[in-house]
A protein has these predicted regions:
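Cytosolic regulatory regions of ion transport systems
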Residues: 1-236
Length: 236
């Protein structure tokens, strides 16, 4: 039986919403873009997504969008007030499990809390994707942020119980010179990995790598089992 694809709704199809949609689609998720402005409603620019021309601040729009079937809803408009309304409606009226909201004005950051239905509040497209996949990232390599003006990336992989990496030593991974495991997070503890450290299910491994391999990382991790993907990527 085919694995169910995560359904993600995005309110706001401007540059930010489109960028997030493309990355989530590349990662194998099902995406619906909701846009109320005619000039931004351009299905041809993200053809693999579903589109809805409507105002996501309206309950009727979220009903039409099937918000109750969304695993995640992202409020990605350029208006903080709209993002707060979308987040509150998604959580309180439709019970969306995870709501990610874009903060446009830093002075409004204090409002973006669970009181408004917001699980994760972020300000950049990359952080939005990480916020979305934070709830569904087991077995997936997730890019957290760019480093050194985009020349390198910080990414994480959470090991599921059935992953062949479980029980292996860090030293046996054979990572190349341009990729390093910098931290292991286990049970709330931060561990500096050593060659003899044995990996356990649930471990969060943080990697720093050359940004030029990001697309290869994503294609490999999301298109194959993690152990095979890491072998293909890192050559071990």
């Amino acid at each position: 039986m085919a694995e169910r694809r995560t359904r993600i709704g995005i309110a706001g199809a401007g540059n930010v919403g489109r960028s997030v949609a493309r990355e989530l689609l590349d990662n194998g998720h099902k995406v619906l873009l909701i846009e109320r402005e005619r000039r931004k409603f351009e299905p041809h620019v993200v053809p693999d997504a579903d589109w809805l021309f409507a105002d996501a601040c309206e309950v009727t729009t979220l009903e039409e969008a099937g918000a109750e079937t969304c695993d995640v809803l992202i409020a990605a408009t350029g208006d903080d007030k709209a993002n707060l309304v979308v987040g509150l409606l998604a959580k309180s009226e439709f019970g969306v499990p995870r709501v990610v909201a874009r903060i446009n004005e830093i002075r409004n950051e204090w409002l973006f809390t669970q009181a408004w239905g917001i699980d994760v509040a972020v300000s950049t497209p990359g952080a939005m994707v990480a916020g979305v996949e934070g709830a569904i990232d087991v077995g997936h390599l997730i890019r957290l942020m760019g480093l050194r003006q985009g020349q390198a990336d910080l990414a994480k992989l959470t090991l599921p119980e059935d992953n062949p990496l479980v029980g292996q030593r860090v030293g046996d991974l054979g990572l190349p010179a341009n990729t390093a495991m910098v931290t292991l997070v286990r049970g709330g503890s931060v561990i500096l990995p050593t060659p003899d450290q044995v990996l356990e299910a649930g471990d969060e491994m943080l990697f720093v790598s050359d940004s030029s391999v990001e697309s290869a990382i994503r294609a490999a991790i999301h298109g194959a089992e993690p152990i095979r993907a890491l072998k293909d990527l890192y050559g071990f």
